[in-house]
Amino acid sequence: MILVIDVGNTNTVFGVYDGKKLLNHWRMETSKGKTSDEYGMFIVSLLSYEKIDVGKIEAVVIASVVPPIMYSLEHAIRKYFKLEPMVVGPGIKTGINIKYENPREVGADRIINAVAALELYGGPLIIVDFGTATTFCAVSSKGEYLGGVICPGIKISAEALFQKTAKLPKIDLVKPETVIGRNTVSSMQSGIIYGYVGEVDYIVRRMKKEMKEDNIKVIATGGLARLIASESETIDEINGLLTLEGLRIIYERNK
């Protein structure tokens, strides 16, 4: 069995695989203040609760976009699992030719998503990840990572609206029944949700034109993927566990 860990700006997701089967996964808030013991005891308690023997974990794979967390997390793995974690970064085999001007600038999560999507769906692809930031990644039919787009995430956009407009209330990110709002809350929900749907569809269409390939599949992942995909005209499929799957595949290519 292997433990995979995806450290994002907002949440950290843990998953355990037995071969290609995901046994379970858990989510916690990403916190820069946690000690290695806090991480270690948290992970061990999760596994114990699910009756997963810690001693049967053969490897740990970590991807992170939050560097300050890595020292404590890596130390936790060494202390509680007696393993040297595999950290996705330079030197790790991904099987993808990165066409970015500076490949080191590409976030590990974006490459991992591309690895998983190529394995599961084949190219060409556009991957839309609805995280703290929303990212769009273009992958060619040859398996090349072409580049992409980075936008403020839905929650960041909503928070900016709340903070900069004194009279507007905080609202839940819920899709209203109509675009035309009949009160302040539904008008704000409409602007945030349907405005974001329009942004996603426009960017995807432009990317498809620039990629100049046929049958480009669009895969959505991330916490708010279902909310947007339900209204999107361009998203073909949702896979909320794409990053965990990518970590498993990368481990197989590097073990």
UniProtKB/Swiss-Prot annotation:
Q: How is the cofactor bound?
A: A monovalent cation. Ammonium or potassium.
Output the Gene Ontology cellular-component terms.
Answer: cytoplasm
Q: Does the keyword Calcium apply?
A: no
Give any GO molecular function from the UniProt entry.
ATP binding
Q: Known catalysed reaction(s)?
A: (R)-pantothenate + ATP = (R)-4'-phosphopantothenate + ADP + H(+)
Task: Give one Pfam family.
Answer: Pan_kinase
InterPro entries per record: ATPase_NBD, Type_III_PanK
Major location category of this protein: cytoplasm
Protein residues bound to substrate: 100, 107-110, 184
The keyword Kinase is annotated on this UniProt entry: yes
Cofactors demanded by this protein: NH4(+); K(+)
**Domain of life here?**
Bacteria
Subunit record text: Homodimer.
The record's similarity note reads:
Belongs to the type III pantothenate kinase family.
The name this protein carries in UniProt is Type III pantothenate kinase
As recorded in Swiss-Prot or TrEMBL, the protein's gene is named coaX
